Amino acid sequence: SEMCIRDSFSLVYHDCVIEPWMMDRVSKDEDYMLYALLAGGAPYLVRDGAYPNTDGAFDGEKISLEEMTERCRVVTELHEKTALLELVRHECMTADGSVQKSEFSDGTYVICDFAEQIYEIGYGA
């Protein structure tokens, strides 16, 4: 499926490259935080592009600093637990790729539902 991320870079290099992810909720249909969770990445709290509406800096849904900080806290907590672990599995759980799951070597998993814009984190050993 086009929606299903099959990011071999994240699978192969997850435990040796820190790749920060934007925390923007671009629209009611796309939330970058979900991608950060799937990859076990680190968050950007505030990321301004060099030019407005370019370089990944788009005016999407406005999120308060308080909410952005809470979103970053969730991603940071996961990253702290998984940064040095292998990202051992990524799968699409639905045919259209709207629900995806990542699993780390200690059993920690993340399920993201892109249609409903929700996630579940289960921490391993």
Can you name each region flagged by the protein language model?
Residues 1-125:
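Active-site-proximal substrate-binding groove within the catalytic cores of carbohydrate-active enzymes
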